[in-house]
């Protein structure tokens, strides 16, 4: 398998055998700029990252550091050496607050190494107390607009299929509860406790959370019964799943036009941020990806809203499904493709019928699992809301959120540090809870007077 990262920048590539190092030390993205830069270079020196030891600490103010947009859980930065120094560009990831509620870092780091063996995602370079350095890939992050490109939809379908098939589950993972249910069952009682412990009332109340728990249990029981005779369905396989397939976690790497065969062009699309990755049902990544079409996390005033009109129609979803099942046939040596950006048309009737059955199977599975994806992120939003926000009356009111004081930005940043009030987590959770109920209504379950979600 080709390592496409190395095709981008030969001098910037690390291979899967590159030993990652560990050191003590932590970074605070709210530190004044000179202090932040100095600490970054000190930790790089401690980790003995290739060629960086030649850069003296006195030049820390000459580092190129830029905040990268897209990540909601962590603060992520691009770090490059001063002019005149040749050292690999780095991706710096500073873990966000309260992430221990969601993420087992040891499992995540093991998964990164596991993925690197298949050239999926960046390589881990070094770890420190509250973050890590990764291989930097020259790339463009997908946006709420670019994900609507049909060619990229084909790439997404192919890449998700490869992720689900190349990374084999460990024996103990096969026996685990799918993350779609496991996360909700763990996060729901914690979210209830958080709402109950608030000093000030929110739009999301304790009474709402009690009703939600009952409705989630009813939905879960429905899914168990519905899927009982569908264990062999394509969309219900247990796979190694990304579990956070939002557009900010998909990179389009920059590669020389002739460096990658046409049949493998889809591998210029690189999934990143595997913090939530683990065993899950195949359809979850697809359902979550489609749900993220409704989001615009960089909207200047309403970054928490979900625009239902932006949800992909069936033809757009079918394009992703078709690419997924076609790539599965490629992996199983049932088909060869010449150009990964196109779908094959000259296939046997038998394979065509198989694809049609698998596509409808995926569509039904996506509709069934979509409420789980939405309620999971709704609970995540509540738990992400910082304790310090108790000082504010109601986080669900956008105008109040916009008026709060901002913390200091690091030079060159384009988005605020993790922990600032720029993202309305409670407003986001309210939107996702509504989508949960709308999805339940579409399945014939109690939607609590919400409209039925239209899959068009």
Curated annotation (Swiss-Prot):
Its cofactor is Mg(2+). InterPro entries: Choline_kin_N, Kinase-like_dom_sf. Its EC number is 2.7.1.32. GO terms for molecular function: ATP binding; choline kinase activity; ethanolamine kinase activity. Pathway: Phospholipid metabolism; phosphatidylcholine biosynthesis; phosphocholine from choline: step 1/1. Its main location: cytoplasm. Keywords: ATP-binding, Cytoplasm, Kinase, Lipid biosynthesis, Lipid metabolism, Nucleotide-binding, Nucleus, Phospholipid biosynthesis, Phospholipid metabolism, Transferase. GO terms for cellular component: cytoplasm; cytosol; nucleus. One of its GO terms (biological process) is phosphatidylethanolamine biosynthetic process. SUPFAM superfamilies: Protein kinase-like (PK-like) (SSF56112). The keyword Cytoplasm applies. It is found in: Cytoplasm; Nucleus. Pfam families: Choline_kin_N, Choline_kinase. It catalyses: choline + ATP = phosphocholine + ADP + H(+). Belongs to the choline/ethanolamine kinase family. Catalyzes the committed step in the synthesis of phosphatidylcholine by the CDP-choline pathway. Monomer. This is Choline kinase. It comes from Schizosaccharomyces pombe (strain 972 / ATCC 24843) (Fission yeast).
């Amino acid at each position: 398998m080709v390592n496409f990262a190395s095709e981008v920048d030969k001098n910037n590539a690390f291979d899967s055998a590159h030993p990652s190092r560990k050191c003590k030390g932590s970074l605070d993205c709210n530190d004044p700029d000179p202090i932040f830069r100095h600490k970054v270079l000190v930790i790089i020196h401690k980790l003995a990252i290739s060629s960086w030891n030649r850069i003296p600490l006195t030049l820390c103010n000459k580092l190129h550091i830029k905040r990268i947009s897209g990540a909601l859980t962590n603060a992520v930065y691009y770090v490059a050496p001063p002019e005149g120094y040749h050292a690999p560009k780095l991706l710096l990831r500073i873990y966000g607050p309260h992430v221990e509620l969601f993420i087992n870092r040891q499992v995540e780091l093991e998964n990164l190494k596991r993925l690197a063996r298949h050239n999926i995602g960046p390589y881990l370079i070094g770890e420190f107390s509250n973050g890590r350095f990764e291989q930097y890939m020259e790339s463009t992050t997908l946006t709420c607009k670019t994900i609507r490109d049909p060619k990229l939809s084909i790439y997404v379908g192919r890449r998700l299929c490869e992720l689900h098939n190349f990374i084999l589950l460990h024996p103990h993972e096969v026996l685990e509860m799918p993350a779609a249910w496991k996360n909700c069952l763990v996060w729901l009682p914690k979210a209830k406790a958080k709402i109950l412990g608030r000093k000030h009332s929110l739009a999301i109340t304790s009474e709402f959370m009690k009703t939600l728990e009952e409705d989630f249990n009813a939905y879960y029981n429905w899914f168990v019964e519905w899927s009982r005779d569908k264990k062999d369905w394509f969309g219900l396989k247990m796979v190694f799943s990304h579990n956070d397939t939002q557009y900010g976690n998909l990179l389009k790497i920059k590669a020389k036009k002739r460096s990658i065969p046409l049949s493998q062009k889809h591998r210029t699309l690189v999934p990143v941020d595997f913090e939530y990755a683990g065993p899950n049902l195949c359809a979850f990544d697809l359902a979550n990806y489609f749900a993220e079409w409704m989001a615009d996390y960089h909207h200047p005033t309403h970054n928490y809203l979900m625009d239902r009109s932006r949800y992909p129609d069936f033809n757009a979803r079918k394009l992703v499904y078709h690419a997924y099942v076609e790539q599965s046939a490629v992996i199983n040596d049932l088909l060869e493709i010449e150009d990964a950006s196109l779908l094959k048309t000259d296939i046997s009737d038998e394979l065509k019928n198989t694809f049609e059955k698998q596509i409808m199977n995926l569509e039904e599975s996506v509709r069934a699992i979509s409420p789980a994806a939405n309620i999971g992120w709704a609970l995540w939003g509540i738990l992400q809301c910082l304790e310090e926000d108790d000082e504010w009356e109601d986080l669900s009111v956008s105008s109040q959120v916009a008026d709060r004081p901002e913390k200091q930005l690091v030079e060159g940043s384009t988005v605020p540090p993790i922990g600032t009030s720029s993202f309305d987590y409670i407003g986001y959770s309210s939107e996702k809870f509504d989508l949960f109920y709308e999805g339940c209504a579409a399945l014939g379950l109690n939607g609590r007077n919400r409209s039925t979600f239209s899959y068009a």
